[in-house]
Structure formats: structure tokens, C-alpha cells
Amino acid sequence: MWVITHALTGMSLGAVLGQRGAPLWAVVAAALLLHVLLDMVPHWDYVRTRHRVIWSLGDVGATAALLIWAATLGDASWAVLLAGAVSALPDLDVLNALWPGERRIRIFPSHWSGFPHGSAPPVPGTVVQAAVWVASVLVMWNAGW
């Protein structure tokens, strides 16, 4: 999934868990688990495209803008911010798209070659992510954030 998809789903998880009074350590653990689970859903990743540098800069930039907005103007709780950041953090390895050459370093276990990472063609894979964005926003709205 894209970095922003992980951030949005993490934020929605943080909104729900924060509303229920979950401790921050549990929010962090749940956000990491959510990242792994979402990576198994069939989706399209831009990391193997010709324009991966543009995609990764846009994705990471949009995610940073979202989290900064949530922290400053959005009045987000610590649970929302932490879950959003932690869920997105493993995908920062997309920034190695900026490096020359084809070798890609993957640090997070769900990014390793043996992990059952979901894959889909660009259009349906992007539609899946857009549906996840909408669901995440609805969950946050329903949780009062």
C-alpha cells in the first residue's frame, strides 16, 4: 500500500483505540500489525514503475502534510498521530527509489520477498487503496475525529 494509505488507516485505528482509552504502547503495536495486514491485501505499488521517484516524493510529501495538518490544525490526539506515523513509517523505504540503480533495500518484514505481499494491476489496485482511504475517513469521522 502507499505510505498515505497506511497513515490514514493508522490514524483511523488510533481514533478508535484512543476513544476507547487504549494505552499508547497498544496503539503502536496495533498500528504495526495493521501495516502488515494491509500489505497482504491486493494493491498496486509504484515502486517498480518508471516514475517511482515522482510517486514516492508525492506520496511521502502528502503523508507528511497530512500528519502535520492533523497535529497542528486538526487537533488530533496522540493516539491518532502516533498510530498514523507508526503505520506509515515502515513504508519510508520507498525513498530508496531516489537512489540510482535497481537495488531496493527492504527493512520491514512485510516488504521482504518471501512475504505474501498483495499485488494488483494499477487501476484495480489504486481503486482498492481509494476505498481504504474513504473507509478510514469514515471511521475517523464516526470516532469523533
Regions found by a protein language model. Give the residues of each.
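N-terminal membrane-targeting hydrophobic helices
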Residues: 1-145
